[in-house]
Amino acid sequence: MADFFTTPGGIAVLILAQVLAVIGFVMVSLLFLVYGDRKIWAAVQMRRGPNVVGTFGLLQTVADALKYVVKEVVVPAGADKTVFMLAPMTSFVLALLAWAVIPFNDGWVLSDINVAILFVFAISSLEVYGVIMGGWASNSKYPFLGSLRSAAQMISYEVSLGLIIIGVIISTGSMNFGGIVAAQDGPYGFFSWYWLPHFPMVFLFFISCLAETNRPPFDLPEAESELVAGYQVEYSSTPFLLFMAGEYIAIFLMCALTSLLFFGGWLSPIPGLPDGVFWMIAKMAFFFFLFAMVKAITPRYRYDQLMRLGWKVFLPFSLVWVVFVAFAAKFEWFWGAYARWGMGG
């Protein structure tokens, strides 16, 4: 049996099993993410939230998903049916594809490529096409306006996200997530991670992630009071479910990126405790909790405020930070905290 897995067919079976394992983890996590999001929102508003279907309401997300699947798929009159159906599938598949390079532990990754950050950034940039396709193919002005806003918002904040990530790359000398985590492995545990030397950028990165994933307070494309639910207004049944699933998977991906880039990934926060996948999942869950809390307690920004924040505040600040990190790494300021090439490169 062991010899079989050394053959091309056996290797293909192993790769397929690994792919299915990652997809299974993401999809099962998705059920709990939606449930947790609704529970946190309910707790802030002093409500109970989902509590009927299953124990503590844990099966509510499954029931909602089944409800969407069994409903009729309604295509608006005059819509481009092919593009209309292709848009949610594009968003969903691209959201899943980015997980191919996300490690959960040392060596636990589908594709351990040296340009993993560029891969994730490229996939994230492509996700705007699903939104544009959905808004344009609906043959309605409300989805189209929502898709245009979403495209402008996502492209604007990708610039600041990229510059913040460049600062981490300069410090590490690597675009591989394993190398970045290895560079944060120090004797001081939690205080060896990049959140400390890159402290201002952690906040900018988190806020940019909110804007990139269209989460409150930056949910301009889905502003019900202005755009009638934005680019999703004409969608129902399974296509709408795919859009929602893709959005939550992208949010979970941003939680994973925050953990890997600034908070040590699978590294233990306490020296002496073993590292492992538990820490990675715990950090991702914590950052999703922050996403949910921000959604529950913050009002929505106006569109002009959102654009001004991205172009006039985040972009100049992150650009200056890249220059600062470059000099700090070159001349090894602050005891070499910005120059860890030998550790992670």
Swiss-Prot record:
Assigned keywords, A-Z: Cell inner membrane, Cell membrane, Membrane, NAD, Quinone, Translocase, Transmembrane, Transmembrane helix, Ubiquinone
UniProt-listed GO biological process terms: aerobic respiration
InterPro entries named among the record's database cross-references: NADH_UbQ_OxRdtase_su1/FPO, NADH_UbQ_OxRdtase_su1_CS
Membrane topology: Multi-pass membrane protein
Main location: membrane
Segments forming a coiled coil: none
EC number: 7.1.1.-
Name of the top EC class for this enzyme: translocase
Protein's cellular compartments: Cell inner membrane
Catalytic activity: a quinone + NADH + 5 H(+)(in) = a quinol + NAD(+) + 4 H(+)(out)
Membrane spanning residue stretches: 13-33, 84-104, 115-135, 161-181, 190-210, 248-268, 277-297, 309-329
Gene Ontology MF term list: NADH dehydrogenase activity; oxidoreductase activity, acting on NAD(P)H, quinone or similar compound as acceptor; quinone binding
Function per UniProt: NDH-1 shuttles electrons from NADH, via FMN and iron-sulfur (Fe-S) centers, to quinones in the respiratory chain. The immediate electron acceptor for the enzyme in this species is believed to be ubiquinone. Couples the redox reaction to proton translocation (for every two electrons transferred, four hydrogen ions are translocated across the cytoplasmic membrane), and thus conserves the redox energy in a proton gradient. This subunit may bind ubiquinone.
Complexes and interactors: NDH-1 is composed of 14 different subunits. Subunits NuoA, H, J, K, L, M, N constitute the membrane sector of the complex.
Record-stated family: Belongs to the complex I subunit 1 family.
Name under which the protein is recorded: NADH-quinone oxidoreductase subunit H
Species: Roseobacter denitrificans (strain ATCC 33942 / OCh 114)
